[in-house]
Amino acid sequence: PISRPRRYAWAMAARIALLLLLGFAAACAQRGVPPRTVERLELERYLGTWYEIASFPSWFQRNCVATQATYSRTDDGRVRVENACRDKTLSGAWNGIEGIAWPAEPGDFTRLKVQFFWPMRGDYWVLALDPDYRWALVGHPNREYLWVLSRTRAIEEPRYAEIVALAQAQGYDVTKLRRTLQPA
């Protein structure tokens, strides 16, 4: 017969193993489910300049500070994307790239396809958006890319924490977020 303390230890170990297994299963399930986008986006209100507050590091933004994106309509109804940043320091040279974006589904600007180089395309999903279009949370459905954008170069810390919590709730690894240096 197994002693009472030993049974208790086995029961606790089994509970802990079950909790770990359930946590792992929940994490895997979240990975298989694409993130949710905002229900609706009014493109005319979204157009204009946005400043990057934070992002996941990426090879294509290596050495970037003071990063900003400007969106405008093209004659054919698509969106012109102009990304710019300074090289390494706030006084560094400006670097930029132009691309084009269009809705993945006609009329739905919450999920865009973006192309900077033919034939490569990327996904640009608006995950959260301030009702007054003051800030936006943008990500890729594979959760490897994430951006916190604002109409101003700075955002209040409590608001930033709320946005980060929204990203985490959608399954993004927010420990990878890095703040973007912007001029004061």
Language-model region placement:
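A beta-rich soluble binding module of mature secreted/lumenal proteins
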Residues: 16, 23, 28-184
